[in-house]
């Protein structure tokens, strides 16, 4: 496995691979790998002759007061994990090589970024889109793999790809979970033992809402209230950021669940901000 630390190194190698007729799969990450990341890599390995993993804690997607400095890092371990999944290259740039001091160009998908996580993180998806577009261009990826846990992110990236006619296919992998249902996240390390014990109730309440919807409950308000009641009882350490029901592609809020519908949430527990989602109807 090759290790690249500059955009120029990555671009040169990927051009050479394409010239040799090799297609390229990209798995963009911020590191501190868990089984969810490993699933993305394993899937990416099946999609193309060459697998590129990017490991970059992107400062542009962190807002003021967020956990950029504290975000967990273990580059040596992550490099070994990427190699174990057959990555041909790992891209580990310094922020200064990705963003000049006077960087002024941003990519946005405002309609899809406005709600859900965008409500409390207004510049987050601008940073995500900008760095992902950079990675697409540098790697010349034919396919890129993202996770369903970050549903809004993958929906925004799919729209960016469509709107800009980018020659890359997006694949979304199901969320990987702990045995008790908690979605895997690098930020789970922030949880105290008490918070960790309650955190699976996020998923349990979403499953309850899915069951109600599939039994015929159609009011988004009533479904939301059912989740909030369970959380009030079983998730007392949680502080709600948002809980909403939207169309899975447009991310427009829904009043009635009569077709495709996604319930998505963010809950703060201590230092951690946990996100999850569930398709009520697909």
From Swiss-Prot:
Keywords: ATP-binding, Cytoplasm, Ligase, Nucleotide-binding, Pantothenate biosynthesis
Cross-referenced CDD domains: PanC (cd00560)
Molecular functions (GO terms): ATP binding; pantoate-beta-alanine ligase activity
Reactions listed under catalytic activity: (R)-pantoate + beta-alanine + ATP = (R)-pantothenate + AMP + diphosphate + H(+)
Enzyme Commission number(s) from the entry: 6.3.2.1
Domain of life: Bacteria
InterPro entries cross-referenced by the UniProt entry: Pantoate_ligase, Pantoate_ligase_C, Rossmann-like_a/b/a_fold
GO CC list: cytosol
Pathway stated in the Swiss-Prot or TrEMBL entry: Cofactor biosynthesis; (R)-pantothenate biosynthesis; (R)-pantothenate from (R)-pantoate and beta-alanine: step 1/1
Binding annotation for (R)-pantoate: 61, 153
Binding positions for ATP per the UniProt entry: 30-37, 147-150, 176, 184-187
Top EC category: ligase
Residue positions of the active site: 37
GO biological process, one term: pantothenate biosynthetic process
Presence of the UniProt keyword Disulfide bond in the record: no
Span of the signal peptide: none
Binding site for beta-alanine: 61
HAMAP family, per database record: PanC
Note: The reaction proceeds by a bi uni uni bi ping pong mechanism.
Subunit structure: Homodimer.
Stated family: Belongs to the pantothenate synthetase family.
Protein name: Pantothenate synthetase
Gene: panC
């Amino acid at each position: 496995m090759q290790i690249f630390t500059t955009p120029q190194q990555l671009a040169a190698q990927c051009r050479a691979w394409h010239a040799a007729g090799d297609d390229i799969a990209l798995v963009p990450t911020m590191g501190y790998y868990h089984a969810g990341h490993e699933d993305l890599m394993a899937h990416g390995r099946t999609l193309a002759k060459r697998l590129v993993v990017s490991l970059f804690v992107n400062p542009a997607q962190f807002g003021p007061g967020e956990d950029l400095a504290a975000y967990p890092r273990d580059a040596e371990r992550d490099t070994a994990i990427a190699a174990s999944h057959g990555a041909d290259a790992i891209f580990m740039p310094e922020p200064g090589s990705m963003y000049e001091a006077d960087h002024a160009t941003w990519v946005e998908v405002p309609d899809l970024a406005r709600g859900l996580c965008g409500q409390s993180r207004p510049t987050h998806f601008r940073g995500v889109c900008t760095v992902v577009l950079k990675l697409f261009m540098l790697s010349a990826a034919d396919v890129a793999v993202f996770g369903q846990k970050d549903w809004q992110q993958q929906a925004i990236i799919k729209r960016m790809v469509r709107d800009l006619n980018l020659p890359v296919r997006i694949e979304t992998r199901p969320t990987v979970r702990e045995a008790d249902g908690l979605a895997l996240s690098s930020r789970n390390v922030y949880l105290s033992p008490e918070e960790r014990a309650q955190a699976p109730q996020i998923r349990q309440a979403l499953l309850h809402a899915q069951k109600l919807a599939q039994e015929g409950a159609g009011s988004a308000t009533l479904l939301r209230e059912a989740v909030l009641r369970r959380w009030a009882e079983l998730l007392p350490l949680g502080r709600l950021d948002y809980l909403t029901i939207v169309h899975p592609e447009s991310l427009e809020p829904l009043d009635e669940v009569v077709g495709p519908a996604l319930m998505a949430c963010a809950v703060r527990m201590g230092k951690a901000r946990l996100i999850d989602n569930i398709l009520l109807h697909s």
